[in-house]
Amino acid sequence: MSCQLLPVLLLLLLRASCPWGHEQGPRSPSEEPPEEEIPKEDGILVLSRHTLGLALREHPALLVEFYAPWCGHCQALAPEYSKAAAVLAAESSVVMLAKVDGPAQPELAEEFGVTEYPTLKFFRDGNRTHPEEYTGPREAEGIAEWLRRRVGPSAMRLEDEAAAQALIDGRDLVVIGFFQDLHDEDVATFLALAQDALDMTFGLTDRPQLFQQFGLTKDTVVLFKKFDEGRADFPVDEELGLDLGDLSRFLVTHSMRLVTEFNSQTSAKIFAARILNHLLLFVNQTLAAHRELLVGFGEAAPHFRGQVLFVVVDVAADNEHVLQYFGLKAEAAPTLRLVNLETTKKYAPVDGGPVTTASITAFCHAVLNGQVKPYLLSQEVPPDWDQRPVKTLVGKNFEQVAFDETKNVFVKFYAPWCTHCKEMAPAWEALAEKYQDHEDVIIAELDATANELDAFAVHGFPTLKYFPAGPGRKVIEYKSTRDLGTFSKFLDNGGVLPTEEPLEEPAAPFPEPPANSTMGSKEEL
């Protein structure tokens, strides 16, 4: 120990005798570079605890990515992050992009509350204590636009008809705030929303001639679009003012096409639409007869604007995962399904008749009025479902087994693609083998991507639930360490663990978010 400590003491004495920045001789690789030399990689500042302060002083607008070398999401972000830096540099933007290796700089990770990777924080004017959490997209142009709207105006000031018309003509989605007083609090609300609505272009005016030009007599936010109705107005409440949440919901709802085709480019926006009911028309777009159905589908859509999102799924395209989610085969097209994203309940037309404007309208009304019962997916019960130590449950036998009053049933709800589920599989098998001679204990598993339950919905994987023997259909969710010892203690104590047991381990979300979504794309520490 003393042999290791002596060089450290000598180094401290030498540093105490030399002013920082005036040391002579070459630096060792482990030493930090002088303050004026913050290293760069692909146009990105590489920061440490010694250089973050300097970067904040030199750059009034600094976006910092906290990453981990082993993080797959970080690796996917890296090229887009570098492209964004290049785009902003070409524009001579005041924004600088930087990164911090979280595991190598634990002091910084702790200081800024980093618990998952990647985490991005935006620092303004050297303020180290209150950075803004980055909430934008994970592709280069989206990153650049998010930053542009924070260092520049988020809405263009419109002075005349020509400027307004040029803005409207130049983009698919344009939002213009018509306010008689630009110093009103409602304008601040409008500009705050404009910072984050990156798929729309924003304008702002107080000019009376523009109010007259667009037929307005009071403060109004107008969405101009090059499809469907062409325009949607959101009048500002004269007493309550402009509510950020209400305006946001309005813009999201009316910026969606009345009918949207599901594909990799639209999926993220479909799930972000905040409309809980989605009506899906499954068609084979290579067939003329199927394409003709889209007309009637579109004619029904306006009646349910804001209540039901109308989506077309082409079974001839790469949409097998959507078919699987609804338990359908491509041969079932054309057919309708409605799903509520909050409850995950799915509905199918009862009569199975032709798809027409009238039948679509009637089906939507029936579901919204609670007149249609949801259907549940289930695989067939395997002949050998109870022959292995881990019993196989499906939708059709779950109730009978899980709520058997003579058995204590411990169930793993999993997804075949879930990494966490695969990691815990050996411990689950070992648990089943350990208790296979206990007649009152059943260890089971259920593929929750192929089987649905009326009793509850499964939202993450793995989900572990314990169904103790006795009346009352009691359910206890297991939220502790996933290993044989802790599982055993839980079972032996009747579904209870001592309070000092470790907290729950992470679970994968269900369903998995789209690859380009900003949600769910982080790795926990």
From Swiss-Prot:
EC identifiers of the protein: 5.3.4.1
Pfam families noted in UniProt: Thioredoxin (PF00085), Thioredoxin_6 (PF13848)
Domain (Thioredoxin) ranges: 27-152, 367-496
PTM note: The disulfide-linked homodimer exhibits an enhanced chaperone activity.
Active site: C71 (nucleophile), C74 (nucleophile), C418 (nucleophile), C421 (nucleophile)
Annotated compartments: Endoplasmic reticulum lumen
Disulfide cross-links: C71-C74, C418-C421
Reactions performed catalytically: Catalyzes the rearrangement of -S-S- bonds in proteins
Site location (Contributes to redox potential value): G72, H73, T419, H420
UniProt record, GO biological process: protein folding; response to endoplasmic reticulum stress
Family affiliation: Belongs to the protein disulfide isomerase family.
Protein's UniProt name: Protein disulfide-isomerase A2
Native source species: Pongo abelii (Sumatran orangutan)
Source organism phylogeny: Eukaryota, Metazoa, Chordata, Craniata, Vertebrata
Gene this protein is translated from: PDIA2
